[in-house]
């Protein structure tokens, strides 16, 4: 039985979307048990599952504008913090929240804790591509600054994830750089390139450019947290902006445009589904002693369900335990 | 009279697109004179203008896969190098090429030369936004590594450009960062934020995120070359990929989808025009003693025409001379 702690109070649609996602997941997966942290009365309004589920009541919660580190230190009874605490005390195997990202990162680092040997856990998401074949990218912004050694570790972390959770036998690992030639980049990239080239446990395919990552250039894309965050946001901003512009072009285009859009509806929907990656689950703060996963703040019940499914897969495949072994200093060849 | 040196042999559609663009520009602007560098016989195939134009024949040219610095050192008679040389010798006021970007940057730095006081010229483009109001961004990758002082200079450079060439009275200058709060970012960003906050000659509006830059967050976006390059490529990859996916959804969607697309044609075209920024001209290696401007490698005659128009505006407004004054150490307050 996998025990998953869920922060019922985090995100724009909490607790309804969270609890409904939990209902769905409990109905489908018989090998999971859910602990819901939050306002008991409010949770009960939506909870239909009655097996393998418990509520841990608390009035306290972390708000989206709370200062992350301060919040997890001061609000010891917040739903998110109690969930992380349960993982620390081995009462739960993993924790999920759709709340304040920074606070969840802080709870992950300071409450759940790093795997021994992992210097700086990275935030990793499975991102969509135009080819229909998603890719994992990290660090997406857990760190503002990274060293080449961190990037080296991200390559190993991402490769483990793609292999275990996404079932890719030999994930192609690429280093995000400003050109594909091996001599490209700043000193950080040059140093990281050397380290990745020598790393026998991964399939390093060299540098990849931000223009190509959404067209299947690699299965795992390694970036420092600053650049990874900027690229993620550039992709989001461009994608959302394009869709919004298309929509307003249709809405302001009169009857002809509306009829055209109606005829194209199925195709646009199919396109949207290709680009929708909520089925891949949430963003993992990877390199911690247990899965700590962030659902998007605007998650609906489906997205919560998929994140639970993702966490279950992480627990099933024991990807974290494998990482603990891989990073154990005793195992190091050097 | 503004004398503009044009590399007739650079880019995918050279020399035809280049020469046709020159024909258009010469017909419209009576105050410019063009020097075309390249294969005289081939140029003459397309040249219809016969006033204020001259051809400087050379057999040599820089290829797209030539190693930039080596190429400009070894191929002294290459069309691009001769154009830059003409600027150095004051025989021309500016140089334009659609050829090898790295080689043009090298020719700019080593042949034309930096403005005294500008440490690292930056590559700057006027980029489209969903609001229809474009923005200037630099450095887009002339440098793999930058210091806070370089970013400080980019803010001044970009502001001068937006003011003079784009006619924005008080350009809003934003620092590309991983959050909008002033405490965000790595040490480079924090240091740059301090410098920009104290810079009286610009209208610094604080940090901007990559998600918002295409929605009108700032008129000038300041980035280090590595991040700027990655964000530019992420925007390009997402934009092109979305359009390609939309196209193939329509093409494979049968008669219904094709009819829908037909009805939407005008609207999609309008949208494409909003996002098309070739009318803003090429990418300027800004901070040099004269305008050195890169047209996109795939430029058609229209894009070449617009780049000549842009360079003419730069010469008309004397933006480079103003920069020379602004960066003159004698003028510094400190």
UniProtKB/Swiss-Prot annotation, chains A, B:
<keyword id="KW-1208">Phospholipid metabolism</keyword>
<dbReference type="GO" id="GO:0005737">
    <property type="term" value="C:cytoplasm"/>
</dbReference>
<protein>
    <recommendedName>
        <fullName>Phosphate acyltransferase</fullName>
        <ecNumber>2.3.1.274</ecNumber>
    </recommendedName>
</protein>
<keyword id="KW-0443">Lipid metabolism</keyword>
<comment type="subunit">
    <text>Homodimer. Probably interacts with PlsY.</text>
</comment>
<dbReference type="InterPro" id="IPR012281">
    <property type="entry name" value="Phospholipid_synth_PlsX-like"/>
</dbReference>
<dbReference type="GO" id="GO:0008654">
    <property type="term" value="P:phospholipid biosynthetic process"/>
</dbReference>
<keyword id="KW-0808">Transferase</keyword>
<dbReference type="GO" id="GO:0006633">
    <property type="term" value="P:fatty acid biosynthetic process"/>
</dbReference>
<keyword id="KW-0963">Cytoplasm</keyword>
<comment type="similarity">
    <text>Belongs to the PlsX family.</text>
</comment>
<keyword id="KW-0594">Phospholipid biosynthesis</keyword>
<comment type="pathway">
    <text>Lipid metabolism; phospholipid metabolism.</text>
</comment>
<dbReference type="GO" id="GO:0043811">
    <property type="term" value="F:phosphate:acyl-[acyl carrier protein] acyltransferase activity"/>
</dbReference>
<dbReference type="Pfam" id="PF02504">
    <property type="entry name" value="FA_synthesis"/>
</dbReference>
<keyword id="KW-0444">Lipid biosynthesis</keyword>
<comment type="function">
    <text>Catalyzes the reversible formation of acyl-phosphate (acyl-PO(4)) from acyl-[acyl-carrier-protein] (acyl-ACP). This enzyme utilizes acyl-ACP as fatty acyl donor, but not acyl-CoA.</text>
</comment>
<dbReference type="InterPro" id="IPR003664">
    <property type="entry name" value="FA_synthesis"/>
</dbReference>
């Amino acid at each position: 039985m996998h025990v998953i702690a869920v922060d019922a109070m985090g995100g724009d649609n909490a607790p309804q979307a969270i609890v409904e996602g939990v209902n769905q997941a409990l109905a489908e997966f018989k090998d999971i048990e859910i602990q819901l942290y939050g306002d008991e009365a409010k949770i009960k309004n939506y909870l239909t599952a009655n097996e393998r589920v418990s509520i841990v009541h608390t009035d306290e919660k972390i708000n989206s504008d709370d200062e992350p580190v301060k919040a997890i230190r001061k609000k010891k009874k917040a739903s998110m913090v109690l969930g992380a605490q349960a993982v620390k005390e081995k009462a739960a195997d993993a924790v999920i929240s759709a709340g304040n990202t920074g606070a969840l990162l802080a709870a992950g680092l300071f409450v759940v804790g790093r795997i021994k040997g992992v210097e700086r856990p990275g935030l990793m998401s499975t991102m969509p591509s135009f080819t229909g074949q998603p890719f994992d990218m990290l660090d997406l912004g857990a760190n503002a600054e990274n060293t080449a050694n961190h990037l080296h570790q991200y390559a190993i972390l991402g490769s483990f994830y793609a292999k275990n959770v996404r079932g890719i036998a030999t994930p192609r690992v690429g280093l995000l750089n400003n050109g594909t030639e091996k001599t490209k980049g700043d000193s950080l990239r040059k140093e990281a390139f050397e380290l990745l080239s020598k790393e026998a446990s991964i399939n390093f395919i060299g540098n990849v450019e931000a223009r190509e990552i959404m067209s299947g250039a690699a299965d795992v894309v390694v970036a420092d947290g600053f650049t990874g965050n900027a690229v993620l946001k550039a992709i989001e901003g461009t994608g959302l902006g394009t869709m919004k512009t298309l929509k307003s072009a249709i809405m302001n285009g009169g009857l002809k445009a509306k009829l055209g859009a109606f005829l194209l509806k199925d195709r646009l929907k199919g396109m949207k589904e290709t680009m929708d990656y909520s089925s891949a689950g949430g963003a993992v703060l990877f390199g911690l002693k247990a899965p700590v996963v962030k659902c998007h703040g605007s998650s609906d019940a489906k997205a919560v369900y998929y994140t639970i499914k993702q966490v279950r897969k992480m627990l099933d495949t024991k990807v974290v335990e494998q990482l603990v072994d891989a990073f154990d200093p005793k195992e190091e060849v050097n």
